[in-house]
Amino acid sequence: MPNLLLELRSEEIPARMQRKAAGDLKKLVTDALVEAGLSYEGAREYWTPRRLALDIHGLTARSADVREERKGPRTDANEKAIEGFLRGAGLSSVSEAQVVSDPKKGDFYVAVISKPGRATEEIVTDVMPGIIRDFPWPKSMRWGKASSKPGALRWVRPLQSIVCTFGPEHEETTVIPFEIDGITASNITYGHRFHAPEPITVRRFDDYAANLEKAKVILDAERRKDIILHDARDIAFANGLELVEDEGLLEEVSGLVEWPQVLMGSFEEDYLSIPSEIIRLTIKTNQKCFVTRPQGGETLSNKFILVSNIQASDGGKEIVHGNGKVVRARLSDALHFWKRDQGNLPDLETLTASAAKFGLDINKPLDQRMAKLDALDVTFHAKLGTQGARVARIRTLAKQLADITGADAALIDRAAVLAKADLRTEAVGEFPELQGLMGRKYAALQGEDASVAAALEDHYKPQGPSDRVPEDRVAITIALADKLDTLIGFWAIDEKPTGSKDPFALRRAALGVVRILLERKVRLPLLTTTRDIDLLSFFHDRLKVYLRDQGARHDLIDAVLTPDADDLLMVARRVEALTAFITSEDGKNLLAGTKRATQLLAAEEKKGTVIADGVSQALLKLDAEKELFAAISGASKDASDAVAGEDFRSAMEALSKLRGPVDRFFEDVLVNDEDAAIRANRLALLRLIREATGTVADFSKISG
């Protein structure tokens, strides 16, 4: 079977766009070929900083012939209908159509349209220019003399050449020379920009990849990542260190080089007085380098790992020297930020009003930054006021939550007023991702309680399903207050998530609240805090996602969750107890009996059958119905008492006693008795079954 090789070579593609672009190319090309009637065995995409490539193997040489029969009007139809049919079918006269007779419908015209298959080369020539012209780059550009013309080609960076070859695996291939904006596809590519700039003639993927590697280009991004990672580990180990691994940085760096060369640089040990998080971010963000640490250690070393795209004749000494100069300059800036943040602000006299408002100690650096944040009226959101106003709301909300979380009120208040103070530090101004973390470090430096310092970092957590949940009670309180304030505020101004759009990360905030409540066992009645049933429904959606991810069945969640259930921890405990019960033998049998009872009852209610208001013991004629009535009376009381005591397992055990009586009732008793009074009484007995099980869950929503 023939194979198709495609390469689009350009100036350097931003690393963050490469993987998705290669995937888009694969999907767009294969979808277009399949739509044109071709099939293929497999396809794989590749990318480097200067090229997107696609290898499609087992591609059919041509599309199949197509024969279509198109039914037309009756032969005695009006002339306009027949003319329209002929135009649509591409026929010039009715003589070119067939006449088919139908005993019921009469004679009518049928057009037989035969479409011969097309060669793959022709199809590729047709589809590729459109794919390239409409390629979904997040950002693109025009270039050259043609850039001012309407409809000029746009690409992420100037497109330089195209390779497109097609042919059998063991025979000579042919070039498919489609053209777009003056660039004609060929079998010529180029290797490394500096090491091998000469043209390379290729035939198919195997020699294409091999020739590129000879020309100092490793086509497979995963191989480049593997080389970088292993070489970085080895060079660190050889120096008595270990690599601080970073998957995101590894992905980015592998998209910056075609021929990775791993080197080690260093900086003065004096810079290690800077927090390791700042060092790591400085080196990562500005120079795309990895940091190292002593083997088995926690602190960083003064050695860093860099990845070059050039195999230098001096072994990389000049490259290391140049990178080292930049790293040292950046660390010097970081050290300056770190020291300035620990000092006094120059305009303290302008901050006294804000300091008084929040009870701040104007002699402490972090307090000064909070006062500055308030005094500058820094906007949180146009409709939700300033950061200072937000801190005041969080402070009030945290105070209300103190009794629920059991945290010290004074520590909560202190943590609340300092929670956003580090937003005015120079370190966070330079590296916003360090917010919270720097607050903790600066709080510790000025002697804050350990719980307060922890809360400044942890109140942002958890920031996703796998992030750590705060453990300290003060941190839990501030984290809840922060997230609840965000959700309440955006609900108040009707800025809710819609579809896939969630610009303010409200789903993440709600999931954070759910995780804190459940994983730290916090009993918080959400309606008393949010006072919004629609927001409570949003929490329910996040709770369902969380519980399903934990392995809970969706039907059991629905059976327990009522619209006004605002104690999410109790909902989770009910689901846990129901899951254990419903998977037991007693639970399965009771579920079957209960569903039979509720379905029969629902059918009679729908028909308008009379059902007694209550069960009359005088009308209980058979032993089975008497036994069931007695069992329900006892089980219902025991289950209700257990639920009131929040002992859901005991509630389930109480209901399990109904299994035998329910089974015997349906074996021995005819519900629809001829006597209307007895029938109404027995239906009332079924209603008692529904009400008894309803104390713990809506069994009608449980599948099985």
Curated annotation (Swiss-Prot):
GO biological process, one term: arginyl-tRNA aminoacylation
Catalytic activity: tRNA(Gly) + glycine + ATP = glycyl-tRNA(Gly) + AMP + diphosphate
Localization annotation: Cytoplasm
Taxonomic superkingdom: Bacteria
GO MF annotations in UniProt: arginine-tRNA ligase activity; ATP binding; glycine-tRNA ligase activity
EC number(s) stated in the UniProt entry for this protein: 6.1.1.14
Keywords from the UniProt entry: Aminoacyl-tRNA synthetase, ATP-binding, Cytoplasm, Ligase, Nucleotide-binding, Protein biosynthesis
InterPro entries tied to this protein: DALR_anticod-bd, Gly-tRNA-synth_bsu, Gly-tRNA-synth_heterodimer
GO cellular component: a single term: cytosol
Tagged with keyword Lyase: no
Pfam families: DALR_1, tRNA_synt_2f
Quaternary data: Tetramer of two alpha and two beta subunits.
Similarity annotation: Belongs to the class-II aminoacyl-tRNA synthetase family.
Protein name: Glycine--tRNA ligase beta subunit
